Amino acid sequence: IITHKLNPCVGYSRNNNLLVELAEHDIVSYLQSDMVISSNYDVDVLSELEDNCILSATRIEPPLHGESSQTITKDFGTDPNEFKWDEFQSYSITAKQARNIEYFFAPFTFYKKVWMDVGGYDTLFRRSREDSDLLQRFIQKGVKIKQTFKANVYHFSCVTSRGKNWFDPNSEEAKQRVQTQNRADQIELMRFIRKWGNFNHGERKLDRYDMDLVWKTGTIEKLAQFEFYFNRVWLPTQEIKDQLLALHKTDHSFANQLLKFTDKDWENAKQFYNQIDYNEIYQVGEPEGYNIKVEIDNTSLDTFLSGIASLSAILEEAEPGTYELGDVRINVENKVNLAETQITVTNPPFDHSLLTIE
């Protein structure tokens, strides 16, 4: 049993990284706290595990998210105190199938080396998107992604992350928590796009081209809608830079609220989390040299914004030259794909004296 002295919590990403780091055996199997394994779960996952592979088991879930090809929808309860244990165990045996798909989600099993080689979860992500980031790094590195229907668990579905009864439309507390989580998730999504240039959950490798945005005029509110697609953002004045920096001062407030961090708690704990250096991203003036430069000068952005999520795909076929996307100019000197530089994450070192191992 491992406990900690860091108030109020270690955090999801760090917690799982420590789980793997401190594991004494070569194979690690991870379950979330709102999951119940089926009979012979260990035998089932070990029979499907391969080298250089992340193996997910299949989730059996109550009908809260709708049907999907990765899960089995069957209601055995949404409250652990009312869980139909015997019925689930009987059903779980009949639900097992000798088939696999390519998908990644908890619960998962893997060789410890596979996890350690990419650095585990990126502590940049505090409330969501850490799985998608880890999956993208596995794909970039060539790790096999596999989900088996031979092993399954019952998943109470987001009770851990969203709270008990998060789905209850009559609970004001639950609705408020979901709203706060949604706002936190939007911040995490912007962090993901800033890192990878776009978002997906492992459907394909992402290309992260090195790009500079030159913003000559326009509102801060408009700029904030898309500047996270770029590695550096060049601004006309220090005043505008200061305004952008001020927008990010509350980035962690929603995660802190959900995780019950006080301001003092966060000041003590933030040293253990990766964070974005916005002072390096936001620059005043224009770049002297660049690989790809996007210039925006008081133009209509409708066409550009509708196509920005496809910008990496557009650039994939582009030769050096000048292009237009709507009224926006795109200058391509070189195409430098930074995706491979994101594969291995380095998290700040953790103070192991904060842990008690029994």
Model-assigned labels for residue ranges:
Residues 35-79:
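Conserved donor NDP-sugar-binding/catalytic core segment of glycosyltransferases
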Residues 102-119, 124-152:
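A short, conserved alpha-helix in the catalytic core of glycosyltransferases
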Residues 34-48, 293-309:
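Acidic donor-binding/catalytic loop of UDP-sugar-dependent glycosyltransferases
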Residues 28:
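Short aromatic/hydrophobic "clamp" motif used to bind/position activated sugar donors
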Residues 63, 69, 136-212:
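Active-site-adjacent helix/loop segment of glycosyltransferases
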Residues 74-101:
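Short, flexible, basic/aromatic active-site loop/helix in glycosyltransferases
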Residues 6-23, 270-273:
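Glycine-rich, basic loop-to-helix element that forms the pyrophosphate-binding segment
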Residues 31-34, 104, 122, 295:
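Active-site acidic Asp-centered loop
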